[in-house]
């Protein structure tokens, strides 16, 4: 390294790195990621899937909320627009699923083993809840999208480490895939139910004979 910095000749440094790489492959082949995993991780880092999903869910959630309120208080419905919004939401959910799948392949374990992974998984379950319980109500879709955005935003705060790390020994169990996945996913459904309950209570204040039918979402 010193020779390369001084003379701008990196041949010896490259040879040393190549020898180190070969040594690692021989002595640590069970620990080192494969060439395919490294290639996928580079693609994963360039895509910045979860960071982009924060803006996606936030913008779509606010727009869905606007459309839902307009349909209730102004009695203006557009089935084609609602179907388009739902299709876009499903696309984002599938993109979110792809990100989790890539992280699972890269790390070699289920992607809900630390704080960052748990948050992005809860965001995924919140989006899944919106897909499952959506009944042509933009408020339901808006609540799901905004909840996912908030959870994903918290995941990308400075105190949360997004680095892919080795699985700690205490989590090296099939319970991580079965038990932890179900319990953690339930937070998304619980959060959506709570948020919809708050929205319903607020809308009851404005309920009258004209919008009674629309408010019974």
PLM-predicted stretches and their roles:
Residues 1-217:
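Polytopic transmembrane helical bundles with strong interfacial aromatic enrichment
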